[in-house]
Structures are given as C-alpha cells and as structure tokens.
C-alpha cells in the first residue's frame, strides 16, 4: 500500500522513501515514490471517473462523503495516533485534528448549498437559473503540519462539487495519507474518484505540470506556492488555490488582565511547536511598566512550557517539530536574529540530537532596524517594544505576507482602529490568532495566498457558476424587434 490509483493499491516504481517519527528517529513507513507514468495513470483514472461522479448528483455524492465521516469516527483513535507518530504532535492535539476532519463534512455540505448551490427566479425574460459545475480533475497538495485536516479541507468540498482528485501529500507524512485514503476506499468511493500518489519534488512536479489537470489546490510554503503560481501563468483556464504562510503580528495594548494576555500569546505562538501558518511570529508590546510586567510573566511562562514526545504522560503542550532539519533551522534562525542585534529572553534549544524536539524561544528584536521578513516556522517569538499604537500597526504591516493578525486590548475603539488599518485575511480581537473557525473563510493577502480563501469558502474554488435563462417551450414575443417580420 503506497499509491491508490483507479481504486487499487500499487507499489511505487520510483526511488525508496521513508517516514521517520521525529520524536525518536524511528522509521514508521517505507515505500517507493510514484513515477511520472504512475502520475499519468492517476490523472487518467480521475479523468475517466469524473463525469459519472458528477452525474451521480449531489445527494448521492454526499451519502458517500458521509460514509467517509463514519469511517473517520470509527477509526479516529488510529488516525490520531498515526498523525501523532508521523508529525511528533502530542496526542491531545492530534485528537482535535481528527475531530476537525469529522466536523468538516457537515460544514462542507452547508458551504456547498450556501456558496455554490442552485438558485432559480422567474423573470420577464424567462426562468433565470444559477447552477454550479465542477472544474473536472484537480490536484490537492497537502502539508505536513496538519496532514489530515488541511488536505481534507480541499478534498471533501472538491468531491462534493463533483470533481475528481489526485492527492499528493507531503513526503514527510505518507502514512497519514495512506490511512486517510483507505478510509475513503472503505466508504465506497467509486474507483478513480480519489487517487493517491506519494513522492517528493519530482512527483509533485509531474503532477503539477500535467496538462490534463483542471485545477490545483495547494497548502504549504510561500516559496513553493509562488513557483506554482509562475507555472500556472498563461493558463487562465485552470483554477489555482494557494494557501501559504504568514509572518503574523500580535499587538498588546492596554490589557489589564496580563495573565489572560500571556495565555493567548502562548497559544498564538507556541501551539503545534509554532508550526501553524497562523502562528504569531512578531509580538508588539507597549513600552512602560505594564509592558515590562507582561514580558516578565511571558518569559517565565515560556520557560515552563512542557515539551516532549507525542506519547509522553502527562501530555506536553509542545511535541516535536517535523524533523531534525526543521529543528536545526530554528536554531539557525535564532542565531541570525542574535547576530543582527536580537537579545534572547528565553533561548530556543535543540533538546535531543536526531530528533525535532526543541524548547520554545522568545527574543527581543527591538534593536534590529529592519527585521527579516521571514516565516520562521517554529516556536520562536520575536518581541518588539513600541511607543505608540500607530507605530505598532505600521510595524505590524511591514511584511509581504498577510495571513493572520491579532490585537489584545480592552478598548473596542482600539480594535476598530486596528481592524481598519491592519492588512490580513484573519484578524482576531482578544483571542489567539491560531483559532480559526471552519464556518468562516480562511486565507490571506499578499504572499499568503492568491485570493482563494479556503475553509467555508473552499466551495468557491471547487466549482464555477453557470447562468441560464430557460423556458419550457419556444415562443414568440408579443412584439417583434424593429426590422423583423415573420
């Protein structure tokens, strides 16, 4: 079991790949990558199945998707454990991920009907009908940080709309993908409707460049997303939905309950070991005694964050990062900021060689004139002290990204002022900025996306509108146009 094509499991014909548990360096999955020929076979299977899948109708498609939900519920413990082992996230967190996958079914069905259903109105010219049709064959590229929930958020609405899908997961989480697709198979999904190809860059390039794709839905790094955007330039007939990262700001202003503020900062910056695209990367705190008190409490709390393997008891708040390479990258990012003038208040450290386990870091970068506009994808929060609110907002907007932003403030006026001026697709007030709702759109501006918001708005990029004016019979108008005679 490695690749799923035309309703059958196939071994890969490419080179060997393995999945490593980043918390203990143990191999938990092995296989071979898909070749270009196997990618072709997957696309051909999806093309062959697409029209019949569409013609089943929404209700029949929904019944199969709901059968998949039943499979998720029946296998949620195994799926949560698989996600935990492959990503290093603690078990409490992967259980919530599987819960989000289950909840996505009802949300996607509601979004289909609200965003892309059918609407008819009688007009003097006839019956005006708006329908939505699937694009056809689409690819879904999944990330490693939420290897179940995020690709699920593309696949479910795509299938409900009548598309067929080729799923290419992250090469770091193949076991989760294999288990997910096996649950679709058990749900009775017709052959060819969902296909799985595993692999690294070569497999991804073969799929992304395939001429028979009608669209591609991507969640991942800004670098890869920009490459895909360039690749799709000159192909206006193909739909491209990009969900990328962010260099996200969180501003603190005039908060009396600093303990609650510290809690929201921790949840914004360090959950998932900082490996959420919405995580706070930059923290702006007012100068003065109140700001000093908040920072002292924050630094103490960061030092107390429990870090450990996915299965540690009692459970840690932070598990492993996705790999040892990622952990070393965060140490290097911290060193770079220190060399530029940053002062570590809490040092991020690589806890165990061969693993992705790191301790969280907090670094004061106020003295750095121009901060690197980078998404450091890990548990390292950059602190900036500010003198006035306008300065804080200006600094917060100094990024090419625009995914999430937040304000912790007791004043509603301050929030309204902030909301009008901040540039981001997700803006929260007195809530962690990693707390997105599946009943709302999810997406950013700038280098964070291409204006194809996902979550509840994923239905929008899974179908295109068809406008019709209809009548039950051909009929002459009461008055002919000038110059006509019959």
From Swiss-Prot:
Catalytic activity: N-succinyl-L-glutamate 5-semialdehyde + NAD(+) + H2O = N-succinyl-L-glutamate + NADH + 2 H(+)
Pathway(s) annotated for this protein in UniProt: Amino-acid degradation; L-arginine degradation via AST pathway; L-glutamate and succinate from L-arginine: step 4/5
A molecular function GO annotation: succinylglutamate-semialdehyde dehydrogenase activity
EC number: 1.2.1.71
A Pfam family per the record: Aldedh
Alphabetical list of PROSITE patterns matching this protein: ALDEHYDE_DEHYDR_CYS (PS00070), ALDEHYDE_DEHYDR_GLU (PS00687)
Record: residues binding NAD(+): 220-225
Key words of the record: Arginine metabolism, NAD, Oxidoreductase
Enzymatic class: oxidoreductase
Coiled coil (residue ranges): none
Gene3D superfamilies associated with the record: Aldehyde Dehydrogenase, Chain A, domain 1 (3.40.605.10), Aldehyde Dehydrogenase, Chain A, domain 2 (3.40.309.10)
Active site (catalytic residues): 243, 277
One GO biological process term: arginine catabolic process to succinate
The protein's role, per its UniProt record: Catalyzes the NAD-dependent reduction of succinylglutamate semialdehyde into succinylglutamate.
Family the UniProt entry places it in: Belongs to the aldehyde dehydrogenase family. AstD subfamily.
Name of protein: N-succinylglutamate 5-semialdehyde dehydrogenase
Encoding gene per record: astD
């Amino acid at each position: 079991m490695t690749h799923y094509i035309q309703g059958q499991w196939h071994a890969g014909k490419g080179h060997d790949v393995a999945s490593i548990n980043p918390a203990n360096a143990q191999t938990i999955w092995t296989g071979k990558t898909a070749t270009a020929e196997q990618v072709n076979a997957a696309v051909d299977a999806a093309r062959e199945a697409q029209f019949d899948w569409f013609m089943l109708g929404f209700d029949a498609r929904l019944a199969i998707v709901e059968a998949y939900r039943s499979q998720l519920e029946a296998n949620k413990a195994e799926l949560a454990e698989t996600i935990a082992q492959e990503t290093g996230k603690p078990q409490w967190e992967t259980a919530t991920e599987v819960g989000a996958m289950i909840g996505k079914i009802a949300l996607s069905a509601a979004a289909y009907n609200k965003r892309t259903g059918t609407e008819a109105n009688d007009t003097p010219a006839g019956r005006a009908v708006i329908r939505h049709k699937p694009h056809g064959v689409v690819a879904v590229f999944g990330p490693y940080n939420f290897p179940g929930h995020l690709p699920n958020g593309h696949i479910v609405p795509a299938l409900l709309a009548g598309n067929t899908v080729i799923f290419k997961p992250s090469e770091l989480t193949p076991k989760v993908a294999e288990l997910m697709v096996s649950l679709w198979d058990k749900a009775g999904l017709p052959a060819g409707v969902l296909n799985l190809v595993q692999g690294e860059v070569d497999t991804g390039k073969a799929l992304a460049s395939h001429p028979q794709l009608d669209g591609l839905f991507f969640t991942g790094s800004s670098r890869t997303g920009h490459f895909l955007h360039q690749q799709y330039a000159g192909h206006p007939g193909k739909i491209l939905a990009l969900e990328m990262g962010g260099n996200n700001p969180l501003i603190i202003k005039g908060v009396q309950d600093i303990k609650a503020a510290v809690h929201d900062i921790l949840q914004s910056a360090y959950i998932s070991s900082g490996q959420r695209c919405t995580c706070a990367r930059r923290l702006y705190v007012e100068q003065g005694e109140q700001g000093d008190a908040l920072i002292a409490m924050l630094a103490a709390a960061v030092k107390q964050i429990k870090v450990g393997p996915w299965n540690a008891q009692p459970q840690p708040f932070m598990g492993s990062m996705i790999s040892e390479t990622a952990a070393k990258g965060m140490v290097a990012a911290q060193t770079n900021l220190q060399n530029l003038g940053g002062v570590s208040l809490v040092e991020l450290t690589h806890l165990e060689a061969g693993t992705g386990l790191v301790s969280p870091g907090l670094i004061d970068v106020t003295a750095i004139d121009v901060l690197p506009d980078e998404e450091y994808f890990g548990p390292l929060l950059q602190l900036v002290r500010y003198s006035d609110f306008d300065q804080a907002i200006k600094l917060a907007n100094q990024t090419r990204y625009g995914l999430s932003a937040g304000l912790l403030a007791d004043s509603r006026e301050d929030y309204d002022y902030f909301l009008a001026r901040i540039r981001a697709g997700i803006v929260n007030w007195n809530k962690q900025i990693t707390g997105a709702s599946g009943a709302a759109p999810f997406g950013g501006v700038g280098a964070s996306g291409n204006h194809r918001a996902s979550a509840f708005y994923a239905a929008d990029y899974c179908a295109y509108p068809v406008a019709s004016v209809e009548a039950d019979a051909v009929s002459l108008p009461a008055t002919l146009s000038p110059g006509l005679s019959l």
